[in-house]
Amino acid sequence: MKIVAVRSYLQHMALTKPYSIAGYTFSDVSIAFLEVELANGIIGLGTASPAEEVVGETAEMSAVHLASDFVQNLVGRDIEDFQQLIQEARAHFDHLPGTQAAIDIALHDAYGLLVGKSVSAILGRKIQALPTSVTIGLMSIPEALAEAREFKKLGFTVLKVKTGENVEEDIEKVIRLQEIVP
């Protein structure tokens, strides 16, 4: 099945509440989107929201790369060759992990929708499900405990806790969080 169109765009979205990690506080997020449309109308969707401080790329940079001639040249290619297309993108965007991710995800999504399989089934899922974790950012103990209670109400059973500001406080925070979500 041929790829007939690719579209990319950038969206800025406010977070429901600020999030602090590694000395930064975020109140909104920018996400680069890539749509890969097949001849039968199926649209695969990929996204990237890289942090420049971590990988040297921003969502804005990803959006520019996703609008490049290289990505536009996916039009006319066969989605059945998605693995080859991903390898070509990895080589072309060698030091741009966000751009690579958006292309990889969009192509996997389009192919999966075409063959009626989830991406995890295409990749060879061996187990049925894993619990999804949720991250508690850098915040005070009372705030972390309140957030953990809210996450537990939402059904989360695995917490990822950001630490590093104060060792004694971090130890107390982790111990008290384990009382809420063992």
Question: Which residues make up each language-model segment?
Answer:
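Glycine-rich anion/phosphate-binding loops
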Residues: 26, 96-104, 141, 145
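Structured loop/turn residues at beta-strand edges in well-structured enzyme cores
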Residues: 1, 101, 154
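Structured beta-strand/loop patches that form or line metal/cofactor-binding pockets in enzymes
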Residues: 1-42, 46-55
